[in-house]
């Protein structure tokens, strides 16, 4: 009989003995590196744009056991834009909820007040407006589709989402979540990082800087210079290139100001590059 894979199998460093857990709390969240690099959570655009560009992640197919076993080579992510201000916080809440209650099941229930706290929303703001915002974010996250196909021309496909079920029962004030076990491998040790949230908390409403932080946090030590073209792609901004570059420079400066980043910006030919000297998730780079 096939053994069901649950969240506890991938939130621990040792899946055999369930030892050395990766801590999920108000200052840390576990995030798949792929999610942080692909631009699933991006800043709100300056003008209306409900849908993000299709994200082709076919190059990751060799890392998915599910994709290899089923012969899927064409993998795409589509759906509404997920912002940093609310949607990313709700996603953090989802990860934390599963880290607490998904030990033996991929389907969990918890009180709305607890879920909102896990998302990082103050308890004193649990009003009708916040409930509506969280419910809308759950809908958007559930609607983010991941499609697996056996080649671009194949008519056979497997469609799933970032989460299988996201249900908020306003009558009982309960949130119900269910995950697709086929995607748990995204959280395996080689492909996940502990994202510390000090910078997110220090950048309220500064979505470009927040999104840039999550991308830079996913990079390995001593990364190569990063072109602004790559940063524009990751942030999925929709303004003119010149304006995008200005916005990116402002966000980089903000990360430097809060003590998260020591970096230089240089121009080579027609392109700008970010050169990272040091990163400090605890915002202590200026004191080091």
Swiss-Prot record:
GO biological process: DNA replication initiation; plasmid maintenance
Family: Belongs to the initiator RepB protein family.
A Pfam family it matches: Rep3_N
The protein, known as: Protein RepA
Keywords: DNA replication, Plasmid, Plasmid copy control
Organism name: Escherichia coli
Gene giving rise to this polypeptide: repA
Function: This protein is essential for plasmid replication; it is involved in copy control functions.
GO molecular-function terms, A-Z: DNA-directed DNA polymerase activity
Top-level taxonomy: Bacteria, Pseudomonadati, Pseudomonadota, Gammaproteobacteria, Enterobacterales
